[in-house]
């Protein structure tokens, strides 16, 4: 993938520059969300499957419940933090 030079971007009209910036910001936001999901899933998987050998391609009921609970707690916490920051 080639990168755009500063000169190439500056030669665009204002509307095109704005559209490119919005696209880049959108892609960065998507990347952050995907990274967070990956980190939460990894952390919760390690928490819920600590010291257990992987014996199947599927989760048992206890593992599934633990993962759901772990992820929901993180989501709830993040929502509360965002709400608190927005309230300031």
From Swiss-Prot:
Q: Which GO terms describe its biological process?
A: protein insertion into mitochondrial inner membrane
Disulfide partners: 44-70, 48-66
Would I find Membrane among this entry's keywords?
Answer: yes
Q: Which InterPro entries match?
A: Tim10-like (IPR004217), Tim10-like_dom_sf (IPR035427)
Which terms in the Gene Ontology molecular function aspect does this entry carry?
A: metal ion binding; protein transporter activity
Q: Does the record's keyword annotation contain Membrane?
A: yes
Q: Its domain of life?
A: Eukaryota
* Cited SUPFAM superfamilies: Tim10-like (SSF144122)
* Pfam families named among the record's database cross-references: zf-Tim10_DDP (PF02953)
Q: How does this protein lie in the membrane?
A: Peripheral membrane protein
Instruction: Tell me a GO cellular component.
Output: mitochondrial intermembrane space protein transporter complex
Query: Where can this protein be found?
Result: Mitochondrion inner membrane
Q: Keywords of this protein's UniProt record, alphabetized? A: Chaperone, Disulfide bond, Membrane, Metal-binding, Mitochondrion, Mitochondrion inner membrane, Protein transport, Translocation, Transport, Zinc
Give the record's subunit note.
Heterohexamer; composed of 3 copies of TIM8 and 3 copies of TIM13, named soluble 70 kDa complex. Associates with the TIM22 complex, whose core is composed of TIM22 and TIM54. Interacts with the transmembrane regions of multi-pass transmembrane proteins in transit.
Function of the molecule: Mitochondrial intermembrane chaperone that participates in the import and insertion of some multi-pass transmembrane proteins into the mitochondrial inner membrane. Also required for the transfer of beta-barrel precursors from the TOM complex to the sorting and assembly machinery (SAM complex) of the outer membrane. Acts as a chaperone-like protein that protects the hydrophobic precursors from aggregation and guide them through the mitochondrial intermembrane space.
Q: Which family does it belong to?
A: Belongs to the small Tim family.
What UniProt notes about the protein's domains is: The twin CX3C motif contains 4 conserved Cys residues that form 2 disulfide bonds in the mitochondrial intermembrane space. However, during the transit of TIM8 from cytoplasm into mitochondrion, the Cys residues probably coordinate zinc, thereby preventing folding and allowing its transfer across mitochondrial outer membrane.
Protein name, UniProt field: Mitochondrial import inner membrane translocase subunit TIM8
Question: Whose protein is this, by species?
Answer: Candida albicans (strain SC5314 / ATCC MYA-2876)
């Amino acid at each position: 993938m080639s990168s755009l030079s500063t000169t190439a971007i500056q030669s665009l009209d204002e509307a095109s520059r704005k559209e490119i910036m919005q696209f880049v910001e959108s892609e960065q936001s998507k990347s952050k969300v995907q990274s967070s999901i990956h980190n939460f899933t990894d952390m919760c998987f390690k928490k819920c499957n600590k010291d257990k050998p992987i014996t199947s391609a599927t989760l048992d009921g206890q593992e599934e419940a633990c993962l759901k609970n772990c992820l929901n707690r993180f989501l709830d916490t993040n929502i509360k933090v965002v709400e608190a920051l927005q309230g300031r």
